A protein has these predicted regions:
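Post-HEXXH active-site segment of zinc metalloproteases
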Residues: 213-214, 218, 359, 380-407
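Active-site scaffold of zinc-dependent metalloenzymes
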Residues: 173-176, 180, 335-363, 374, ...
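Active-site recognition of the HExxH zinc-binding catalytic motif
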Residues: 361-381, 402-406, 457
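N-terminal helix-rich structural modules
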Residues: 23-193, 502, 509-512, 565-568, ...
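C-terminal motif of bacterial Sec signal peptides marking the signal peptidase cleavage site
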Residues: 14-16
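Active-site-proximal, well-structured secondary-structure segments within enzyme catalytic domains
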Residues: 155-160, 195-356, 429-440, 446, ...
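C-terminal, non-catalytic "cap/extension" segments appended to globular domains
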Residues: 18-35, 61, 67-70, 115, ...
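Post-HExxH zinc-binding segment in Zn-dependent metallohydrolases
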Residues: 231-241, 394-432
Length: 607
């Protein structure tokens, strides 16, 4: 009898448990359905409003007419409308309440709801006047930056003209004039930057962030301290190599400019880049003079060749609208308006309307840049698919976009690739160590600029409320500490040299994306070279390899619908690490140490 009673009790319990399970499943489905309705409506409106805002923003970047504020006014209105939607209380309240039951939701729903709140934090509806003021200030700052008229000795010059002078000019006095001309724009941007700092900080504080830097870092699922520690870790790992490069560059540049006393810090106007972020043009590799080959091409060939590369990997041809709507080439000298000359890729409608803004001329820099920008374009096209909601049509994180674009630019510059295109003679002899040195002067030199000067300046600007009378002092302290460079003459606080870098104004508090992207690109490239192509990572040829194309497309296609760490581990088998980058440049250390024998090392030790 007792046995039967136990069995009966068990059956009752099982029946009750079954009912509970069924009820719970029904309840979970009901909440999931409710969330899905909310998200579907949100995604539709988000896509619509972003399309309008992107079109308005596009005009402010491609047609800057002095004295005509119509594009700016239209852009302000479109951005305010988008901000009012993403930051409205209905969306914030719903996303917040749904996330309280996130254990009942699908992972994709949870990701979207968190994205809703992240986007709301920059535009909270409770602070509408503040958001409108920020949008207006951002539009004006962009117009002031890109509408600026550069002059050398009173003569109008373009940003490209200045870059060419810094690349080719041998006379130090003329170089200094060009460098100083490039910094004049900062004077008029300083007050706007301080205003934007305050507006950006106050805006995100409305949803609980301490400052704008913390807000931007949070997209990685990290705290500010965690991000800073990771950046410093990468910087320290690459420090020994950069120290050798810095010493080598000081002595070689002093020799080039016939300066007897080698300075401890490299004068900025000695370098071929306005911010000292890329020194690669200091080295010419015999047998790989791409510029001379490209002189016979026109600007359109450069971009079309980039498309042919992606198509060879199995990607589709670019949409017809890309060619119709993009702004790819420099304006004629007699143009009645200006444009932003900084290369960028645009995802206009979060679907197939993709565009690029460039000023392509047939040289090696624009050749590499075009391959890079098309990397963004194909990333957009890959994740614009029914499996990825509009909210998550982004890179796995912001660094992924830059990593894949930069990787394709690097792949297009490798010797076997260029030989395949007859851009350099087949089986041409070149100095492999000089090639590696040239690459290091790009990729390695960039790390202290991005992780140090830029990221630490913006950290101090937003997280420490850097005072207006210390902006230039702090900028050059960081440039000395991390890059080992100095201005050609004293730069007082009437200047704002940081603001001459476009990202400080219009892509704020996220320049570390580029640093992380370089680490990531070498990790992914190393995997492709060794596991798919079975080639030396220094001498690869991606061209025409469909397996490489599929591997890259598989990373691109999920967009932000999968965790970035999961994507990396799944595709490469390891977590984010600078090891592949260190391995790639390891042959260079012995060479540089030999070159630097008897030379004085002056780069500051990193603490």
């Amino acid at each position: 009898m007792k046995k039967n009673l136990i069995l009966l009790t068990g059956l009752v319990a099982l029946f009750a448990c079954g009912n509970d399970t069924s009820n719970n499943a029904n309840a979970d489905k009901a909440i999931q359905d409710s969330v899905q309705t909310f998200l579907s409506n949100y995604n539709t409106k988000y896509q619509e409003k972003n399309t309008i805002a992107n079109e308005a923003s596009w005009l402010t970047q491609t047609k800057i007419v002095e004295g005509d504020s119509s594009n700016a006014i239209a852009n302000n209105k479109a951005q305010e409308d988008l901000a009012a939607f993403t930051g409205n209380s209905f969306n914030i309240d719903n996303a917040t309440n749904y996330l309280k039951q996130q254990e009942k939701l699908t992972p994709l729903q949870v990701k979207q709801l968190k994205s809703v709140l992240y986007k709301a934090a920059n535009n909270p509806g409770t602070l509408q006047d503040l958001v409108k003021a920020r949008i207006k200030a951002e539009t004006k700052q962009t117009e002031d930056l890109f509408g600026f008229e550069f002059k050398i000795d009173g003569k109008k010059v373009s940003a490209n003209d200045i870059d060419e002078k810094l690349a080719d000019e041998k006379n130090l006095e003329k170089r200094q004039k060009a460098w100083e001309a490039s910094k004049e724009v900062g004077k008029g941007l300083k007050n706007g930057l301080m205003n934007l700092r305050d507006l950006r900080n106050k805006t995100v504080q409305g949803l609980g962030y301490n400052n704008y830097f913390e807000y931007q870092v949070s997209e990685y699922g990290m705290t500010t301290d965690e991000m800073v520690q990771m950046l410093q870790k990468f910087n320290k790992e690459l420090y020994p190599l950069f120290r050798e490069l810095h010493t080598y560059a000081r002595y070689e540049l002093a020799k080039k400019y016939k300066v007897k006393e080698v300075p401890e810090l490299i004068p900025s106007h000695w370098l071929p880049n306005r911010w000292g972020q890329d020194w690669s043009s200091l080295v010419d590799v015999e047998g790989i003079n791409l510029d001379s080959a490209l002189k016979t091409k026109d600007a359109e060939w450069i971009v079309k060749q980039g498309e042919r590369f992606y198509v060879s990997l199995g990607f589709p041809e670019l949409p017809k609208t890309f060619w119709e709507k993009s702004d790819l080439y420099p304006l004629p000298k007699d143009a009645k308006y200006k444009k932003n000359n900084h290369a960028s890729a645009w995802h206009m409608d979060y679907d197939k309307d993709v565009r690029s803004l460039m000023s392509v001329t047939p040289n090696s820099e624009w050749y590499e840049t075009s391959h890079h920008e098309l990397g963004h374009i194909y990333y957009y096209l890959c994740y614009s698919n029914p499996e990825v909601p509009a909210l998550l049509r982004e890179g796995a994180n912001r660094a992924y976009h830059e990593a894949l674009g930069s990787m394709m630019g690097m792949a297009a510059m490798q010797k076997p690739f260029m030989e395949n295109l007859d851009l350099i003679p087949k089986n041409s002899k070149s100095d492999e160590m000089q090639t590696l040195l040239k690459e290091a002067l790009n990729y390695v030199v960039f790390i202290p600029f991005s992780t140090g000067t830029m990221s630490m300046f913006e950290h101090d600007l937003y997280a420490k409320n850097l005072p207006a009378d210390q902006l230039n002092k702090r900028w050059w302290e960081l440039a000395a500490q991390y890059q080992g460079i100095a201005p050609p003459a004293n730069r007082g606080e009437e200047y704002c040299d940081a603001a001459t870098k476009t990202h400080i104004n219009d892509d704020p508090a996220q320049y570390y994306d580029y640093a992380l992207s370089f680490v990531l690109l070498f990790q992914v490239h190393d995997h492709i070279a060794k596991n798919i192509l079975h080639q030396d990572p220094h001498n690869t040829n991606y061209y025409g390899n469909k397996e490489v194309g599929k591997f890259i497309a598989d990373i691109m296609t999920p967009g932000a619908s999968k965790d970035w760490r999961e994507v990396l581990k799944e595709k490469t088998g390891s977590d984010l690490s600078a090891k592949a980058m260190l391995d790639y440049f390891s042959p260079l250390m012995d060479y540089l140490k030999k070159q630097n024998e008897g030379r004085k090392y002056t780069l500051s030790e990193l603490k």
